[in-house]
C-alpha cells in the first residue's frame, strides 16, 4: 500500500489551454520547495465543496528539476463526478488545495535504450515531466501525441517550440495526420520501451498491435487514471471480520456498498484505482482487477484488490474486513 502524506498548497496561477483544459500552478504555502518527484509522478488532489468531497489523481507535468512549484492540467469531463468541474469552475488564484506527496506508477525504465511516448488527449501530461527529466540525458526519446484537431491539442505551442522539437510528432485526426500505429510499432528499435497514456481505445490499440507484433510485454507501460467502467454482474460480498454480507449491485463498487452501509472503515484517496490506499486482502474468491496500481504478477496472485474499482469474477467474494 502506498504511503501518502497530505499537505496544503496554494494556487498561484490558472491558465486556460483549450476550451476544456486548464493548467494549475501550485506552490507551497510557506514558500519553500515542494517535495521532490520524478517524471511520470502524480498527486492526489482532495477538494471540498460544501457537503461534497472529491478526490482525483493528476499527473505532474512540470519539471522534476524545479520543485519551486507543481503543475497539473485538468480536462473538464462531460460526465464529471465533480472534481474536474470544481477545479474548472470554482478554484482561483490564491485558493488552497490539499494534495498528496507525489507517487510514481509510470516511471521511466532506466535500462531502456530509447523511450517511445504515445499520448492521447489529456494523456500528454505525464510525458511533459518525462521529457523535462530527460533534458540532460543522452537517452533517446520520441513523442507521438494524438488529438482531434489543433485547437484541442493542449500544450501544442510549447511542444512545437520544444528545444528538441524534432522528436515531437503531433497527430490530428481532423487534418489527416492520424497516427499510423502499426507502422510506428513495427519500426521500433531493440531496447525501446513504449509508454502509453490516454483513453481506453488508444491503450487497447497499442496492446493489440504490440501483441500482434510479438513485442515483449515487459517493454510496454500504460497509465489511465479515468476508469471508464466500474460496473459488472452483481455478486455477494462477505466481510470476514464482522461476518456481514451484502449484495454488490451491477452499478455500484464494493467501496460504495461498504460506505453506504457503514460496514467497515476503509481509507481511499483517489477512487480511481491509482493510489493503493484501499488495498484489501482477498480471503475467498477472485477479483476482476480494474486498477492501475498492481503489476500483472500481483493481479495474477489474487492476494489483494483495490475495492474502489475492482469487482468479483464470480458470485461470491470474501474480504479481510
Curated annotation (Swiss-Prot):
Domain FAD-binding FR-type: 4-109
Iron is among the record's keywords: yes
Biological processes per GO annotation: carnitine metabolic process
Cofactor or coenzyme needed: FMN; [2Fe-2S] cluster
Start and end residues of each 2Fe-2S ferredoxin-type domain: 233-321
Catalytic activity line of the entry: (R)-carnitine + NADH + O2 + H(+) = (3R)-3-hydroxy-4-oxobutanoate + trimethylamine + NAD(+) + H2O; (R)-carnitine + NADPH + O2 + H(+) = (3R)-3-hydroxy-4-oxobutanoate + trimethylamine + NADP(+) + H2O
Keywords: 2Fe-2S, Flavoprotein, FMN, Iron, Iron-sulfur, Metal-binding, NAD, NADP, Oxidoreductase
Keyword Magnesium applies: no
Residues spanning the membrane: none
SUPFAM superfamilies named among the record's database cross-references: 2Fe-2S ferredoxin-like (SSF54292), Ferredoxin reductase-like, C-terminal NADP-linked domain (SSF52343), Riboflavin synthase domain-like (SSF63380)
EC number: 1.14.13.239
Subunit structure of this chain's protein: Composed of an oxygenase subunit (yeaW) and a reductase subunit (yeaX).
Functional summary from the UniProt entry: Converts carnitine to trimethylamine and malic semialdehyde. Can also use gamma-butyrobetaine, choline and betaine as substrates.
Family matches, as HAMAP family: Carnitine_monoox_B (MF_02098)
Protein name per its UniProtKB record: Carnitine monooxygenase reductase subunit
Lineage: Bacteria, Pseudomonadati, Pseudomonadota, Gammaproteobacteria, Enterobacterales
